[in-house]
Amino acid sequence: MAPGRVGLAVVLWGLLWLGAGVAGGSETASTGPTITAGAVTNASEAPTSGSPGSAASPEVTPTSTPNPNNVTQNKTTPTEPASPPTTPKPTSTPKSPPTSTPDPKPKNNTTPAKSGRPTKPPGPVWCDRRDPLARYGSRVQIRCRFRNSTRMEFRLQIWRYSMGPSPPIAPAPDLEEVLTNITAPPGGLLVYDSAPNLTDPHVLWAEGAGPGADPPLYSVTGPLPTQRLIIGEVTPATQGMYYLAWGRMDSPHEYGTWVRVRMFRPPSLTLQPHAVMEGQPFKATCTAAAYYPRNPVEFDWFEDDRQVFNPGQIDTQTHEHPDGFTTVSTVTSEAVGGQVPPRTFTCQMTWHRDSVTFSRRNATGLALVLPRPTITMEFGVRHVVCTAGCVPEGVTFAWFLGDDPSPAAKSAVTAQESCDHPGLATVRSTLPISYDYSEYICRLTGYPAGIPVLEHHGSHQPPPRDPTERQVIEAIEWVGIGIGVLAAGVLVVTAIVYVVRTSQSRQRHRR
């Protein structure tokens, strides 16, 4: 019995010892120290946008030197299952320029997770806007960050080239390329030099740039390494290719890069229905004025809500001027004024700024039909009178005599009387009879453009002059002739006396 009891006790003791060992191992695994390579930044503790890092891309900071045999570097161990940290994934340098201050280089060669915040710009320069498109008259700002500019005596020059230089810039500029040891191409105008006292005196400054520019059109602001080029007003003259050259004071062309500034200006739309005379076809003109660039302008015409499809009725022309381009479109109706009611014209203009954006505007106007006036001319004893009935207010007469192309001056007297039609009046003009001309023309002036010339011709023989008046004129003519002869005689006598006295004086001196 004793050996059996002893064996049973040994078995029970072994089972207890084994259970204690298992429990101890579990406690050691759960309570042993956990080695981590970094701390997790919560969203509530994320730095502001002005500081490096963000909640979306936490910065991994080592807290201890891990044992390479027990832990892998840059690997984090979660402490709370509800909010596990994300393991940062290595990212390559982005090709597109960032839009804010780049993050500093992470510690321990750890690359932060890719997020919406920009990273450190590659290359010696980074510009936030390489190809801005701005509205006419607006203000443009281009921000560039120059690497290592605070470690040297930095000098920056900016040159402007027109959009279509002649000869063109060779080779063609690449907006993403950074050039080295390349001087500014010829044909440019200098808009900025951070060291104006070192500028070549033969350099041509752009309008609104350089020392003494009033008002200044260009400015560069901001502390290094970031510089902001500000163009006060974008116009066809200020748009173009801008070449930024920088380097040391003694080597300002160590680096160079291109920035393009483009302008757009939507057209303004006006519709002018033509005033037509009875018997003339209706017309209307639509003008898309002062737009840029010269992208296609499309006109759709409607006459009394019916679209005009016949291309023979529409004439469209484009004109270039310093402020841009203007397109004029004129539609001619098949209907004639006086035979049908006045027509209502609608012009729909579409201008494509680019392949995606366009402007569309409408304008409507009613055509005006004017009655054809009746012009009469009456000759009196001393005056000739010309009358035109029912003409628009503001219309008057101009008189022409014979073949003289200039109007008769200081002789026409104009009066207006009311007419039965609203907005119309009867015009009467009086001109004294001429003793030198027999042909008279009275012409109506002041009609809207497009109205044909309206005039009346008349003939009248010059009346004989008054005998008394003729005698007076002849007497004046004879008096003038007598005065001329007398003056000539006095001059002759004076000359003779002078010659005689001169000869006598010479003879005395000889003696």
UniProtKB/Swiss-Prot annotation:
The record's annotation in SUPFAM superfamilies points to: Immunoglobulin (SSF48726)
Main localisation, per the record? virion
Localisation per UniProt entry: Virion membrane
GO annotation terms (biological process): adhesion receptor-mediated virion attachment to host cell; symbiont entry into host cell; symbiont-mediated suppression of host complement activation
Q: Which residues form a coiled coil?
A: none
Which region ranges are annotated with the description Heparin-binding domain? Answer: 137-151
Give the Virion surface membrane side ranges: 25-480
General remark: There are seven external glycoproteins in HSV-1 and 2: gH, gB, gC, gG, gD, gI, and gE.
Q: What is this protein called?
A: Envelope glycoprotein C
Which gene is this protein's source? gC
